[in-house]
């Protein structure tokens, strides 16, 4: 793909998200979501491999179906109220339709089935886009939607997402599918928090974006596809693999890493609103995340046999990317923030 074409498509993807976030009209929101999706489809299909094309087609079909459902819900809302404004009271039937459409777009259970397969068929950089940037607009809409009094529609899907995110990752050996189920679980944490604090949900979303950006870029740098490959790479680039393990533990919410704030914030608001049983179930779901993240760490770092290096170790430099590359800067900054940013996040709770 030519540079000017890819630049135009990326600008269109960003513009679509900005249109959605800044608009109060349901029709303009639908246009922004479709603009972003249609511009992303050629980007996802840039590899032209059969697996890549299959994942691209699945993504397009799911997004087109959810967009049609969203437009039907918006049309029903406009027919009932005579206005396309998102600020008008929402009917319960149209709210269910809109909630399902937004859940499809972010991969929230029980309509999450497409996300692991799509992410498995894409390169890490394209997977980073659909796991982070493409979820910003639907998530913010869902955050706002939960503030309108329809949070009860989102609590059960969020709880199921947390449990499925833990169960689904237990028996996986493919790195992309582990990232996909982890993303599904984190979507549950974000959405359930938005029912009680919009500002806290936005802070958690920023933390989620930073951690996932770091993890995807590190895996893209190491060219790792399976956990067995990660064990092999650990002997070639031990520092990079150590950073991967730290960021994964941060994504699981292990203190004192940055991801702990994401889980602590959600539990704080749930306990403050006397949802003790719900909090306990979500903790159980997150313990499953801890299990397979720690299992990966043990298998990679603690259970390796000693290796006697006979030749020079200069070949390790082949895995080091140029410090002037944009990915290097983005990966470095996001990795530091993913592991050491707790002191920076604590003052933000003043606004919540």
Swiss-Prot record:
GO biological-process terms attached to the record: mitochondrial electron transport, NADH to ubiquinone
GO cellular component, as recorded: mitochondrial inner membrane; respiratory chain complex I
Keyword line: Electron transport, Membrane, Mitochondrion, Mitochondrion inner membrane, NAD, Respiratory chain, Translocase, Transmembrane, Transmembrane helix, Transport, Ubiquinone
Chain segments annotated as coiled-coil in the UniProt record: none
Reaction(s) this enzyme catalyzes, per UniProt: a ubiquinone + NADH + 5 H(+)(in) = a ubiquinol + NAD(+) + 4 H(+)(out)
Protein location: Mitochondrion inner membrane
InterPro entries, per database record: Complex_I_Subunit_2, NADH_DH_su2_C, NADH_UbQ_OxRdtase_chain2, ND/Mrp_TM
Taxonomic superkingdom: Eukaryota
Topology of the protein relative to the lipid bilayer: Multi-pass membrane protein
Spans through the membrane: 4-24, 26-46, 67-87, 96-116, 124-144, 148-168, 177-197, 198-218, 241-261, 264-284, 290-310, 332-352
One Pfam family, short name: Proton_antipo_M
Class of enzymatic activity (EC top level): translocase
Entry EC number(s): 7.1.1.2
GO molecular function terms listed in the Swiss-Prot or TrEMBL record: NADH dehydrogenase (ubiquinone) activity
PANTHER family: NADH-UBIQUINONE OXIDOREDUCTASE CHAIN 2 (PTHR46552:SF1)
Family: Belongs to the complex I subunit 2 family.
Function: Core subunit of the mitochondrial membrane respiratory chain NADH dehydrogenase (Complex I) that is believed to belong to the minimal assembly required for catalysis. Complex I functions in the transfer of electrons from NADH to the respiratory chain. The immediate electron acceptor for the enzyme is believed to be ubiquinone.
Name this protein carries in UniProt: NADH-ubiquinone oxidoreductase chain 2
Species: Strongylocentrotus purpuratus (Purple sea urchin)
Lineage: Eukaryota, Metazoa, Echinodermata, Eleutherozoa, Echinozoa
Gene this protein is translated from: ND2
């Amino acid at each position: 793909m030519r540079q000017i074409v890819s630049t135009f498509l990326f600008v269109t993807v960003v513009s679509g998200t900005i249109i959605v976030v800044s608009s109060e009209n349901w029709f303009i929101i639908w246009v922004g979501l479709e603009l972003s999706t249609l511009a992303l489809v050629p980007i996802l299909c840039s590899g032209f491999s059969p697996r890549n094309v299959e994942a691209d087609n699945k993504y397009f079909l799911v997004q087109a179906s959810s967009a049609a459902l969203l437009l039907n819900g918006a049309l029903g809302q406009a027919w009932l109220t005579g206005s396309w404004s998102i600020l008008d009271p929402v009917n319960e039937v149209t709210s269910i339709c809109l909630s399902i459409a937004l859940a499809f777009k972010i991969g929230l259970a029980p309509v999450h089935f497409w996300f692991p397969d799509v992410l498995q068929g894409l390169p890490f950089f394209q997977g980073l886009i659909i796991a982070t940037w493409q979820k910003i607009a639907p998530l913010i809409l869902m955050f706002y939607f939960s503030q309108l009094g329809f949070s009860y529609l989102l609590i059960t899907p969020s709880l199921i997402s947390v449990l499925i995110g833990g169960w689904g990752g237990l028996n996986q050996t493919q790195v992309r599918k582990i990232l996909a189920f982890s993303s599904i679980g984190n979507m549950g944490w974000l959405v359930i928090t938005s029912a009680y604090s919009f500002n806290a949900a936005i802070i958690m979303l920023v933390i989620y974006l930073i951690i996932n950006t770091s993890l995807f870029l590190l895996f893209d740098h190491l060219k790792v596809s399976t956990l067995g490959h990660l064990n092999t790479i650990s002997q070639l680039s031990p520092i990079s693999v150590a950073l991967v393990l730290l960021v994964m533990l941060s994504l699981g919410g292990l203190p004192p890493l940055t991801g702990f704030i994401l889980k602590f914030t959600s539990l704080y608001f749930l306990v403050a609103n006397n949802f003790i049983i719900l909090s306990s179930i979500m903790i159980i779901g997150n313990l499953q995340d801890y299990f397979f993240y720690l299992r990966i760490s043990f298998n990679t770092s603690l259970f390796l046999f000693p290796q006697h290096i006979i030749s020079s170790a200069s070949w390790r430099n082949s895995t080091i990317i140029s410090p002037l590359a944009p990915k290097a800067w983005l990966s470095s900054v996001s990795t530091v923030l993913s592991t050491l940013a707790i002191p920076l996040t604590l003052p933000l709770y003043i606004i919540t």
